[in-house]
């Protein structure tokens, strides 16, 4: 029964034992299960014996290897201490790892930046010469401008403008473009300054071509700028002239306009086209015409201001000739202004003649006021009388030398007419005649006032009456004759103005009625002059020798030969 129980429970017991045994113990347990009961009863003893044997062996080994055990124990202790230290350092390392990671990241970023800069430096080194050429463009362009190499300068400007368009965000390129723009402004100023100088058409064409390449001005603005610069050049020439000398200034101004104004108009027409069939901006809208009219107007205004300052008729005539020549030359470009000149010169001629006549009257008055009424030596007279003289001979009668005030007046009138003859406008014939008559009237009025305000002795009164008679019978006709030499038929106009000496005529008529007829003074005589008229003994008359050169051509000046007054030529 017990055997059956044991036999029946053996598999289960074996399974339970095997499940309790470890992997290293399972072979031994399996071996135990295979033993018999007797063998199993002996097994504890056998195990005890083996244990004792092993213990003895261990003791022997321990005795024989105690140093190794001590060393191992020391090593184990040291290892424990080191492991503990390593554990602490490991924890510290774990705490520092994030910092290390961050540092590595920063290093990587810095290294990348350095690498990037290195690449840039390498690229810069590889393109050093090209970049140097680019950076030297402003300096090179400035040198070209200073040396007059405008084509090369404009090529550089176009290249930099293209670079600035392609790389608008690069600061270096923009700075380069800014410097080039400054140099371009200098180039523009230099080109405009050249337009303000004395240059010919080929140079003008080159400069306008450069201005078009720069592109600062539109077509209309460029035309306007061209005319402004050329006007500034003309103004500079006129400013260099001496304005103190009106004659020389006008000569220089007329020559300037005659030569240079003609050139400027031709240059403008050659450079710019006025074809209205093209683009509207190519049409100047009468810009050249307006500018030319401005120049002509300025020319005429200057003439109007400066002509009254000319005091010689010959100079006035020369200015008129030059103005006519200038206007005729400018007529080739449509600027003939000859029709505008007569009023200016008529006014100047009239002013000059009026001034000279006023001077003659003033000088007469001065000499008359200071004149001492003493008889002067008589001189020879023409045998045939005043009215029978040659019509071409306008030499003042020598009889007038006995009357210094009249001689001075005749000198002044001759001077005025001599200044008038080179430039005597026919339209002023009556006006000039009126001025001459007005001067004669002023002399007559002066003599009347003198007669009224002065108390003269008998001898002085006779001399005064002789002077008045000489004025009426000699001076007045002589002035009319001289005026007729300037204006054909003008003598009649003057002679018809008898009202100028009516007062003197009445005085002379009254004096003649009071004196015996045989003692009345005669202005022109072939025998003798009355002693009461001269205050000296009568002297025989000598017939004046005729000078073969006395007869002059129509264009010759009117001479006055008196020893008291220097003749005016």
Swiss-Prot record:
Record field: compositional bias (Polar residues): 511-526
Membrane topology: Peripheral membrane protein
Disulfide bonds: none
GO cellular component, one term: plasmodesma
Pfam families: Dor1
InterPro entries on file: COG8 (IPR007255), COG8_Metazoal_Plant (IPR016632), Cullin_repeat-like_dom_sf (IPR016159)
Primary localisation category: Golgi
Any single GO BP term: Golgi organization
Entry keyword set: Golgi apparatus, Membrane, Protein transport, Transport
One GO MF term attached to the UniProt entry: protein homodimerization activity
Location relative to the cell: Golgi apparatus membrane
Biased composition (Basic and acidic residues): 540-554
Record bears the keyword Transport: yes
Effect of a null allele: Male-specific transmission defect due to incorrect deposition of cell wall components and proteins during pollen tube elongation, thus leading to disrupted pollen tube growth. Embryo- and seedling-lethal associated with white seeds in siliques, delayed embryo development from the early stages, arrested at heart stages and resulting in abnormal curled cotyledons. Altered Golgi bodies morphology. Impaired Gamma-COP and TMN1/EMP12 tight association with the Golgi.
Chain intervals for the UniProt region annotation (Disordered): 511-569
Subunit: Homodimer. Component of the conserved oligomeric Golgi complex which is composed of eight different subunits and is required for normal Golgi morphology and localization. Interacts with COG1, COG3, COG5 and COG6.
The protein's role, per its UniProt record: Acts as a component of the peripheral membrane COG complex that is involved in intra-Golgi protein trafficking. Involved in pollen tube growth by modulating Golgi morphology and vesicle trafficking homeostasis leading to the deposition of cell wall components and proteins at the pollen tube tip. Required for sporophytic development.
Family: Belongs to the COG8 family.
Protein name: Conserved oligomeric Golgi complex subunit 8
Upper classification of the organism: Eukaryota, Viridiplantae, Streptophyta, Embryophyta, Tracheophyta
Gene: COG8
